[in-house]
Amino acid sequence: MKKAIITGVTGQDGGYLAKLLLSKGYKVYGAQRRNTGKRYWRLDELGITDQIEFVDIDLGEPYNIEKVLDKVQPDEFYNLAAQSFVGLSFEQPQVTTITNSLGVLNILEVIRNKYPKIKFYQASTSEMYGKVTETPQKETTRFHPRSPYGCAKAYSHYLTINYRESYDLFACSGILFNHESPMRGEEFVTRKITKGLVHWLKNGKPVELGNLDSKRDWGHAEDYVEAMWLMLQQDTPDDYVIATGKTHTIKDFIVKCLDELEITYFNEGDEFRDNHGNFIIKTNPKFVRPAEVDLLIGDPMKAREKLLWKPKHNLDSLIKDMIQADLKRYGK
């Protein structure tokens, strides 16, 4: 039986990845920080909490990482732990940098020194591209991050490449573009929209958002974790862009959600109102980022050709999943 350890197992990607690995017969270890409150709601909804063995880990302490690996003896290590909210990274740049960079260095050092046969996956991000130099973005596109989050992730990405090339480790990075799901955190715009609209049906409180013209390449997290697994099943390690290759504006996303909920609306500029003139969606300057990234659209051709990765979802099915989940949680 293969064994895998997942940091960030209680997050969106961690939950879906754990479910995938369990379905493939893995023994799954969920690594978590001690005293984090053990927020398992995603794992509970996915019905897998009892199938995961949890281990406490401190990515800031190499000795602790070594002890965990001594105990688990994993075949694969998926590092998904991160402070992943871009907006918060401007408010907490130090915490974001330490969390998203130092931990990766410590993991790679322990693997290099003691467990060089472990296959390692690092969660990189399209936010590393930032001020883009070409569209669509691919594995060779130059990075120009526009947030502390993107900067920290770029460091970890290059570090993973360096350890692969310098020490012959099986270390891969997945440059994942935006991926959503019913398990997305409520601080992210897609989930803020789906949950907010479901609540609007009940209380009429409008959803406040930032720049509705921002474009994103949105996929489904369930598809993207399969790509993570596929990377570690190859004969040689490499880095891959995981994306849909299509973009939509936040306004597009809103319209599809309103249609899914069968809400009648009229739209003028960045405002959406119902038939009585009441706000459904309105903008608030406080939700606009200090530095917005340019058009992010990924080129997934390498992953499709080399990994034979085939996403099962499109934007419509993603939105349907998210809306139905929030209706079930909060009631229509």
Regions found by a protein language model. Give the residues of each.
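A short local structural element in Rossmann-fold oxidoreductases
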Residues: 66, 133, 184-185, 254
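Short, solvent-exposed loop/turn segments at secondary-structure boundaries
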Residues: 91-92, 148, 183-187, 294
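Heptad-repeat alpha-helical coiled-coil signaling segments
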Residues: 178, 182-185, 213-217
